[in-house]
Swiss-Prot record:
Signal peptide segment: none
Gene: ctmA
Family named by the database record: Belongs to the carotenoid/retinoid oxidoreductase family.
EC category: oxidoreductase
Main location: cytoplasm
Regulation of catalytic or functional activity: The presence of molecular oxygen causes a 40% reduction in specific activity.
Induction (record text): By the monoterpene alpha-phellandrene, but not by acetate.
EC number: 1.17.99.8
Catalytically driven reaction(s): (4S)-limonene + A + H2O = (4S)-perillyl alcohol + AH2; (4R)-limonene + A + H2O = (4R)-perillyl alcohol + AH2
Activity profile over pH: Optimum pH is 7.5-8.0.
Protein name, per record: Limonene dehydrogenase subunit A
């Protein structure tokens, strides 16, 4: 067996999106980087596979891409490496929520005035409230995103972040101490506006009943951050391909089939890694001259690879109660032989050309029951409710199915553990029966699914865990985003993420806000490490949040309008 190079400036544990992006930044900047991945493929939660039949490409997790939000799309030249983000041609709306009476809450892709005009059709008074909020927050959107997604989170920066919302005209003074539900019910009057907004915000937060995280997710929806999703040409995995190409072109090395057994800690400093006995290089040690970075979740990194003996009592206590609940997804994929035709398109024809949607709950009470069942009681919602972010893939990218066919995905919120049924293994027993129930609900909103369905594929929460065990059932390996677990106190107070209490050990996962495909965690981790090493960032490392989006919209020929007036 040939012996590989055994020392790198930086070793990254895990070849997920943020691990790849962190590595690409550092390798492009001149450091030598080795990435060690457990599986035989990078980007476990950004996979695209032909699991049904040839030509049907199913995105087996990440589907609502926001890579254009973060700096990496520009800094790493991801489009040069093959990434092509797609939305439906001519689409003006990015998200909608249908109701059984034929109404729909529509959220514009890039123009706040279009959202305002659609809301006027349902509730003129609520539309005026939205106008006041959008006019205030619109000019601040890029600053808000830079602070939330692409900056190191500290207690001080959190207070600065909150200052951006201190004078919003219609906000209750105590909005931070409200749940997401209470916040929405204080701002808006019409039930359908409330439910539509909550459903949009649910894609950004694990628990809308949480204080702080709940209302902040409502803000994300009001700013249009949850109605600005894309797919990628050929499927979500194209993001992974672009990152790998960038990393490898600049000289980076990826070790596949190489699970890491432990991080070497000497004198309270991370010095390298030891591979598992079942890796391609059994029990091999690799040294890190400058840093080790973990792209794994908090418990796996600290309690597993680092070891409790290297952690303080307070850190151990925080990590043992780390919250992975919420955001658990049950997924139906459909192949149809005609374009999806939603019932609400009779009144709102724009829905049929909108990429993302949710469905199921018709009232705020039903929505609250969804979170109560999933996060508090641990029982299955019946009937199912899809609030995880559904996708109408092929109206945006026809290459994801054979000619004349369309793929649609529904993400239902569910509990993971199913303790009342004997544990997570019960998902194997109820997979098809629960999928049938979810389909029965969807047909009420998408009636031609019944006659146009060619095939269905089901992914349970347990299937996701089998693919990526360190997610622990959450849609994000970074864990839940709640008032106790976000910003500078995630993964635990005093961690100082992306730094850790272990010298030269960094994380690019399980920190700040939710780790979506904007790659902000990678940007922050790489930036902070460069600063700690005293290395000036190269001239190409200068992009800000939304720079990629602005260029994308310029080429699409659309004018972004963040305010109504």
């Amino acid at each position: 067996m040939a012996n590989p190079k055994s020392e790198y400036d930086v070793i990254i544990v895990g070849g997920g999106l943020n691990g790849l992006a962190t590595g690409a930044y550092l390798q492009k900047a001149g450091l030598s980087v080795g990435i060690f991945e457990r599986r035989d493929e990078s980007g476990t939660f950004c996979a695209t596979e032909e699991v049904l039949f040839p030509g049907v490409k199913l995105n087996l997790h990440a589907s609502l891409l926001v890579t254009h939000f973060g700096p990496a799309m520009v800094d790493l030249e991801l489009e040069k490496f093959g990434l092509e983000l797609c939305k439906p041609a001519g689409a003006e709306y990015g998200y909608f929520y249908p109701f059984l009476d034929g109404n729909a809450a529509m959220f514009a892709h890039y123009d706040a005035r279009k959202t305002y005009e659609m809301w006027q059709r349902i509730s003129p008074k609520d539309a005026e409230t939205y106008r006041k909020v959008a006019n205030f927050l619109g000019p601040r959107q890029d600053v808000i995103l830079q602070q939330a997604l692409c900056s190191k989170h500290t207690d001080e920066s959190f207070l600065q972040f909150l200052d951006e919302f201190s004078d919003v005209p219609v906000f209750p003074k105590d909005w931070l101490f409200m749940s997401g539900f209470e916040f929405v019910e204080n701002l808006f009057e019409h039930e359908q506006i409330r439910v539509g907004l909550l459903s949009s915000a649910a894609m950004a937060a694990d628990d809308l009943k949480s204080r702080l995280a709940g209302p902040l997710s409502i803000l994300a929806a009001l700013c249009g951050f949850t109605s600005n999703f894309y797919t990628a040409r050929g499927g979500s995995h194209d993001v992974v391909h672009a990152l790998v190409r960038c990393f490898v072109l600049h000289g980076g090395k990826i070790f596949y089939n190489c699970p890491v057994e432990k991080i070497i800690i000497e004198d309270k400093k991370a010095k390298g890694i030891v591979l598992s006995s079942i890796s391609c290089y059994p029990d091999a040690e690799f040294k890190a001259g400058k840093a080790v970075i973990s792209d794994l979740s908090a418990q796996t990194t600290f309690l597993g690879l680092v070891g409790e003996e290297h952690l303080s009592v307070s850190a151990r206590a925080s990590l043992k109660r780390y919250d992975y609940r919420g955001g658990t997804l049950f997924t139906n994929y459909y192949v149809m032989n005609e374009r999806p035709d939603f019932a609400c398109a009779q009144k709102f024809p724009e829905a049929n050309n909108t990429y993302s949607f949710n469905f199921g709950a018709e009232t705020v009470d039903q929505a609250a029951d969804l979170f109560d069942r999933c996060d508090v009681r641990g029982v299955l919602p019946d009937p199912p409710v899809a609030w995880g972010g559904c996708a109408n893939y092929c109206i945006a990218d026809p290459t994801q199915a054979p000619p004349g066919m369309y793929t649609v995905m529904s993400w239902c919120f569910v509990p993971y553990k199913l303790n009342s049924l004997g544990g997570p293994g019960a998902w194997d027993d109820i997979r098809e029966s629960y999928a049938d129930k979810a389909e029965e609900v969807l047909v009420q909103y998408l009636p031609n699914l019944k006659t146009a369905k060619v095939a269905r594929y089901v992914n349970t929460p347990h299937d996701y865990v089998r693919r990526n065990a360190h997610s622990f059932g959450n849609m994000h390996p970074s864990g839940a985003t709640t008032e106790a677990q976000m910003w500078s106190w995630k993964p635990f107070a005093g961690c100082d993420a992306p730094r850790t209490p272990i010298d030269s050990l960094y994380i690019c996962q399980s920190m700040g806000m939710s780790n979506f495909t904007h790659l902000g965690a990678a940007y922050v981790a790489a930036s902070e490490l460069m600063g700690d090493l005293g290395i000036e960032r190269p001239d190409w490392w200068r992009a800000k949040a939304m720079d990629g989006a602005k260029e994308l919209w310029r080429r699409e020929g659309v004018e972004r309008r963040t305010s109504v007036d």
